[in-house]
């Protein structure tokens, strides 16, 4: 029985620059060959004009209405980092950042690259802060770094997710204080704890040895931690029960691993798949092809296209697409006997470096899928395809139908 190999270019959708997008520019003979044999269309990850986060977009793509199941990004980040959340836990997504003496954010990613030595120093600092917070407030803190500047912070105790972010979400704005968003003692306590953590981190981090070295090397210091996306673990029916599909996900990013875990997918990672625009995909594709013999659906997440977009790096985005295509080439014969889906979770145009709400291209190839006249995978061409315009939440039912795994509606 054939399986589905689903390739997701995070933030892959784009707007034309000089009449061309990264998908249109990239030399990707394998993807374009599959395109010439399959059905193309355009996909609204959530709905037309809605600017999706990667979390809400992936929930929708995995077949779950984000308006019903989304409880904040932090819980997914924590799951993806390998943490087990207990009932009542509140998790936040974190960024290591750089601020000036007045608390203005200079870089929300502290230059993005964080060495293992720096990660260890930050985790040690957070462990010390956690001890003080536990004594003072009775709230347990668990911090874990994930990829580059990213991390997760879990609060355990009499806490609430009903608090505001400390991340201003833009450079040149002041680091925010968290505020309770409801009149409860749990929300008030949570905001107080977050503000104490934020304050203590900046006070101590500025004098760390790692920052002395970073300054000598001309790198930005790590002197702030930004929190956002507080949430708790939602109750979600596993994808195996909801769609009768046994699924696996391969991802190097904690968020995507977390969403996949939350919906009951088995989660894998692969050498070279670190969640950056420099990732190499040979091992990830090899693993995906191997897993296709054991799963109905194998999902491969490619983060580098989004990272390049946020950096405004057109050539870098093209390079990510081309490296993935090259990794597919040795397995073309295998792919031709199975189903292949290629799409994005949202557009992140190079020109604005942020998520936008336009539709993205989608390809569905399979031995028994109708072939249309589209021969190049791109925003400029896929709209002409036989698949038409669909929503993210439509993808899993469509795949379940081709796999003959979903139940018939009615008699």
Curated annotation (Swiss-Prot):
EC number(s) from the headed UniProt entry: 5.4.2.12
Lineage: superkingdom: Archaea
Record CDD domains: iPGM_like
Function: Catalyzes the interconversion of 2-phosphoglycerate and 3-phosphoglycerate.
HAMAP family the record matches: ApgM_A
Assigned protein family: Belongs to the BPG-independent phosphoglycerate mutase family. A-PGAM subfamily.
Name used for this protein in its record: 2,3-bisphosphoglycerate-independent phosphoglycerate mutase
Organism expressing this protein natively: Pyrobaculum islandicum (strain DSM 4184 / JCM 9189 / GEO3)
